[in-house]
């Protein structure tokens, strides 16, 4: 199971600037500062997987911050408790108290103003069944306005880590969870006069498509399709309690893609939230449903690194200069070779190439004789590394022509097609494979050359 990072929505007010530390291997120290009525400052000391220590800090130091040190790596934070409320000279609510709990059963001091341990304001608890906190996010200006956390689930494998952003919106309805996929191919959004009532997602997983449906389908719906090189970057939503309904539900959705395209459905009204994880793409949804979509959350995964384009190298054709020049181009590899012989040498060649999942047949070069053709077929995992051959000047043919060809792969050699006579040649480059052919031909094959790329795999 890959690591899944669960991002819990922050508690507190909406003032200050948003910040997000993302995730680390663990937390080593926490520093908290305060004034007479609120938490004004936090500082976190994280440890990365390679042991490097990273420090982040937010807010403003008024009084000397207090320190809480964990016995890293044997101890970690599993819960954060606190309070938030409105205070004098603050336009929105702010965090007034914090307590950190650890896997060793320890508690930090009660940070923030209090009277003999008594606190005021709205209490909150952030925990997830003893799971480890590996990062923080929130809002701050001259104080700590809001605080949220990342929990880690699962164990690290070769699979890339996935971020699960908690569902936001209403609290009613049935819980649903599509899980994470390779990507989202298309989505359909249904609505009535005041709510998002239906969601249909078409996901991709291992080259196959899977469709998940939620809510109640309506006549009014909008389909939004993504291009193969496009992904959903973020979802902005509003939620409210429409007048004629008793539940808080999602009222609008705006999907934004990596190409800058957007798709809007619904009616904006109520509170707003955004599902987004910087530098990552959306790969799945979860939420709550009833007669409408009550709440919505999402999964985010790393953006795949594009496969670098490997420049192809064209090796000059060897042989005579007669006939017309030809060039099959560049492919992923060679699948089949057809060679036709004439009375004095090679009269005809044709190549079948691999391009992605497709087979592409090259043009005929030369002229097929009554002797027909012989073929050399490559197996899965086999690729061409070189060509050996001979060319010579033949009576009745104006310029030299190819007399014989023999093909070498990473596994074997073909039988020679033709006779060993004339000038010998070899085409190929160490550490490269052949991905295309070119040359010159008339009624016979006068010359042949190859295009090669570095060997990166055997497919």
UniProtKB/Swiss-Prot annotation:
PROSITE patterns: JACALIN_LECTIN (PS51752)
Keywords attached to this entry: Lectin, Repeat
Consequences of knocking out this gene: Smaller PYK10 complexes.
InterPro entries linked: Jacalin-like_lectin_dom (IPR001229), Jacalin-like_lectin_dom_plant (IPR033734), Jacalin-like_lectin_dom_sf (IPR036404)
Source superkingdom: Eukaryota
Domain Jacalin-type lectin: 5-153, 162-302, 312-454
Keyword Phosphoprotein: no
GO MF, one example: carbohydrate binding
Pfam families reported for this sequence: Jacalin (PF01419)
Record carries keyword Ion transport: no
Subunit structure: Component of the PYK10 complex, at least composed of PYK10/BGLU23, BGLU21, BGLU22, JAL22, JAL23, PBP1/JAL30, PBP2/JAL31, JAL32, JAL33, JAL34, JAL35, GLL22 and GLL23.
Name listed for the protein in its UniProt record: Jacalin-related lectin 23
Organism expressing this protein natively: Arabidopsis thaliana
Gene name tied to this protein: JAL23
């Amino acid at each position: 199971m890959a690591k899944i990072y669960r991002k819990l929505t922050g508690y507190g007010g909406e003032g200050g600037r948003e910040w997000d530390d993302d995730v680390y291997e663990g937390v080593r120290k926490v520093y908290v500062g305060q004034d007479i009525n609120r938490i004004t400052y936090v500082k976190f000391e994280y440890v990365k997987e390679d042991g490097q220590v990273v420090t982040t800090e937010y807010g403003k130091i008024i009084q000397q911050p207090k320190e809480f040190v964990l016995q890293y790596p044997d101890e970690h934070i599993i819960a954060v408790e606190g309070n938030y409320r409105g205070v004098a000279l603050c336009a929105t609510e702010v965090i007034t108290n914090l307590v950190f709990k650890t896997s060793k059963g320890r508690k930090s001091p009660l940070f923030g103003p209090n009277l003999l341990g008594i606190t005021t304001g709205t209490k909150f608890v952030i925990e997830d069944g003893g799971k480890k906190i590996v990062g923080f996010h929130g809002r701050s200006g001259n104080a700590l306005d809001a605080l949220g956390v990342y929990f880690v689930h699962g164990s690290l494998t070769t699979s890339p880590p996935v971020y699960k952003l908690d569902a936001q919106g209403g609290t009613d309805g049935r819980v649903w969870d599509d899980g994470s996929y390779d990507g989202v191919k298309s989505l359909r959004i249904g609505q009535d006069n005041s709510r998002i009532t239906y969601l249909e997602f078409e996901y991709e997983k291992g080259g196959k498509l899977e469709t998940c449906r939620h809510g109640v389908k309506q006549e009014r719906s909008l389909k939004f399709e993504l291009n193969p090189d496009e992904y959903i970057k973020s979802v902005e939503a509003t939620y409210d309690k429409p007048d004629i309904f008793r539940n808080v539900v999602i009222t609008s959705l705006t999907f934004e893609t990596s190409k800058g395209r957007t798709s809007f459905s619904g009616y904006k009204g109520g509170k707003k939230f955004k599902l987004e994880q910087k530098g990552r793409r959306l790969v799945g949804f979860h939420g709550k449903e009833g007669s409408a979509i009550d709440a919505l959350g999402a999964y985010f995964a790393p953006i795949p690194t594009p496969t670098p384009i490997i420049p192809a190298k064209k090796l000059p054709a060897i042989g005579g200069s007669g006939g017309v020049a030809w060039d099959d181009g560049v492919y992923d590899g060679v699948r089949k070779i057809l060679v036709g012989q004439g009375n004095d040498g090679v009269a005809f060649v044709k190549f079948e190439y691999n391009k992605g999942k497709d087979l592409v047949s090259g043009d005929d070069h030369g002229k097929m004789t009554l002797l027909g053709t012989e073929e050399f077929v490559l197996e899965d995992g086999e690729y061409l590394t070189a060509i050996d051959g001979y060319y010579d000047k033949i009576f009745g043919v104006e310029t030299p022509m190819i007399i014989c060809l023999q093909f070498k792969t990473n596994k074997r050699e073909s039988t020679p097609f033709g006779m060993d006579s004339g000038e010998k040649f070899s085409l190929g480059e160490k550490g490269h494979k052949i991905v295309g052919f070119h040359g010159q031909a008339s009624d016979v094959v006068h010359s042949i050359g190859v295009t090669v790329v570095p060997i990166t795999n055997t497919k």
